[in-house]
Amino acid sequence: MVTSSDQIQNGSEEQSKRSEIYTYEAPWQIYAMNWSIRRDKKYRLAITSLIEQYPNRVEIVQLDESNGEIRSDPNLCFEHPYPPTKTSFIPDKECQRPDLLATSSDFLRLWRISDDESRVELKSCLSSDKNSEFSGPITSFDWNEAEPRRIGTSSIDTTCTIWDIEREVVDTQLIAHDKEVYDIAWGGVGVFASVSEDGSVRVFDLRDKEHSTIIYESGEPSTPLVRLSWNKQDPRYMATVIMGSAKIVVLDIRFPALPVVELQRHQASVNAIAWAPHSSSHICSAGDDSQALIWDISSMGQHVEGGLDPILAYTAGAEVEQLQWSSSQPDWVAIAFSNKLQILRV
């Protein structure tokens, strides 16, 4: 187990570098954050601000491996209307597509990073309501890894919208829930799920847009579900978080209604969850107890007295708002707390 030390103890001396933790301090509180997926930009991340004033900020930062410093490039910093609720780089490991970054707030925006990395330009500003100057805030989005021209967004107006970002048109818009939709996740080319203020996890298949399957309901009236993560290595499993709850609920879509396991070692509300991109049995969580925990759920079918314990723990300096696991480098996890970004070797 690890506390707030300079290294995460994982038992392997060979893996130990000069430091296992790198920290970047932003001039503002960080909210959204994500890793680059491109093979040639493996230590690059985007971070966004949480500022009450209208113009917020987005920075693209990079770890300099030679000296262990995470640096911000002034050419790749830009203003953003309102605080972004999420940011994500295009899922393009092989660098075959334009280098794009997406952000969500009032609209879904796509930003293009120039080939020489000298500037960032707004490529698209997408709104599903063409008749209005304003749009219902977008709470989250997910970029389809199998079909990167598709992005799904969730909104407080109860809808999920599937965008074709190449044609800049709405592919599909569905009334997904009875109340605000807080998160969305793809489970394949044409299948996605969402969670809502109404307390349900629903799965949608784009081949049958009239119907959805309720996989789980929080059980108590007015208990919203706020986060959703779909296991990319084993799409039978997904995980969700109940608003204000210290537990993570893991679901098997083959057996709706009952969780297969509930992970209950956080001491305060969970804010973020992420499945390992390289392992079907590992998931990371982070929350208001300042902890980031990694769990091995391979034994989840068996009864464990007192419940599962995490296999790895890290204590940050404040409540952890954001967590992302690098898909291009699966031994690295990034967390954001207060004005700090940390990348941790796990």
Curated annotation (Swiss-Prot):
Pfam families: WD40. SUPFAM superfamilies: WD40 repeat-like (SSF50978). Induction: Circadian-regulation. Up-regulated y virus infection. Keywords: Acetylation, Biological rhythms, Repeat, Sensory transduction, WD repeat. InterPro entries: DCAF7-like, WD40/YVTN_repeat-like_dom_sf, WD40_repeat_CS, WD40_repeat_dom_sf, WD40_rpt. The modification N-acetylmethionine is found at residue 1. Signal peptide: none annotated. WD repeats lie at residues 79-121, 133-173, 176-214, 265-305. Coiled coil: none annotated. This is WD repeat-containing protein LWD2. It comes from Arabidopsis thaliana. The lineage of its organism: Eukaryota, Viridiplantae, Streptophyta, Embryophyta, Tracheophyta. The gene is LWD2.
